């Protein structure tokens, strides 16, 4: 069960930066990066467009290379994007970053995760394998968001309404 547990964990953690962060902490994300809702929507559109195109070729690449190598590379590359995000980049750089994440999370990762899950399930347990994967990802997502909100509330010096931008960063 170690393999499927790692797939579950990586399958959710890789989407933390491009999806979860901006969704859960939307008002703060908008303020910290000096964005409006239209600009955030544009970032998600850039991500979605690159991801859509990446699905086509991601399956091909997952057949040519070992899934565990692709997963490791995609996690590392996505984390590098997190380093860029931590530097509070401009809107232009954010658009490039979200396109980059479309490549790292879908082109490199998604097909490899699906293939690794299929291999783990074997010939007769595909349904169980994908049920474990999706159920586990949902549980990990709920846990991460709850933990994130708890940590955020602990470190927030004052009420969110009266906190300044420096406290939110």
Region annotations inferred by a language model:
Residues 42-60:
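Central cavity-lining transmembrane alpha-helices of secondary-active solute carriers
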Residues 76-90:
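C-terminal ends and interior cores of transmembrane alpha-helices
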Residues 81, 92-108:
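Hydrophobic core of transmembrane alpha-helices in multi-pass small-molecule transporters
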């Amino acid at each position: 069960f170690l393999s499927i547990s790692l797939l579950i964990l990586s399958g959710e953690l890789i989407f933390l930066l491009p999806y979860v962060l901006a969704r859960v902490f939307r008002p703060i994300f908008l303020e910290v990066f000096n964005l409006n809702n239209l600009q955030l929507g544009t970032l998600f559109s850039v991500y979605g467009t690159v991801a859509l195109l990446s699905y086509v070729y991601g399956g091909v690449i997952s057949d040519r290379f070992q899934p565990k190598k692709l997963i490791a590379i995609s996690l590392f590359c996505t984390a590098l994007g997190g380093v860029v995000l931590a530097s509070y980049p401009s809107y232009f750089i954010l658009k490039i970053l979200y396109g980059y994440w479309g490549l790292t999370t879908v082109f490199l990762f998604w097909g490899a995760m699906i293939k690794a899950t299929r291999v783990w399930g074997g010939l007769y347990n595909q349904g169980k394998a994908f049920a474990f994967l999706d159920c586990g990802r949902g549980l990990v997502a709920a846990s991460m968001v709850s933990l994130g909100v708890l940590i955020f509330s602990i470190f927030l010096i004052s009420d969110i309404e009266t906190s300044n931008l420096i406290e939110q960063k």
